[in-house]
């Protein structure tokens, strides 16, 4: 279940009688529900497309399964496929819905991760040459700058993103930002100023974008980086 706005939710529904799965919209208490579209995958991620009447969805990332990134109008029409061909993919829209980050395995059943960017139609894929997950990223409101946590060396013979999502290991991250239009990267905080180890996820920025917040999976505490 995710929020569409202040007064509606999107949710996946499984009908045990018909065995059909669907994406639906309703009031927060479940009333006034409507089916948006039928879906074929058992587990999906859902994200509204900002500043549009669309909602996007995709099968939950799995290194052995090709991810199908789709969108559909909330008034309920046929779903449109935006992007396919990547395994274990996950997505993160920017603030105006013109771009989405996509993290995916470097191969089917792979142990590496690539981060790329696509436009709102799923085209113009660009590999950003950053080995990180979208769960370690956050967009600036300028819609072109991405703040991200970059992991150090990963264990051998892991399956990504499956093993990370299953919390079979933790990472040791450093913090960066990148202009996705130019490819320019800069550290957010220098190494000598970092104390402790951080496996950062659920990143978000302060309203003035002067601070970066994240949850450290090592101790489940909230941290702040002042920029």
Give residue spans per PLM region.
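Short loop/turn segments immediately following beta-strands, especially the blade-tip
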Residues: 226-227
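Blade-edge beta-strand/turn elements of extracellular beta-propeller
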Residues: 31-36, 75-83, 118-130, 183-190
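Beta-propeller blade signature
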Residues: 24-29, 70-74, 115-121, 166-182
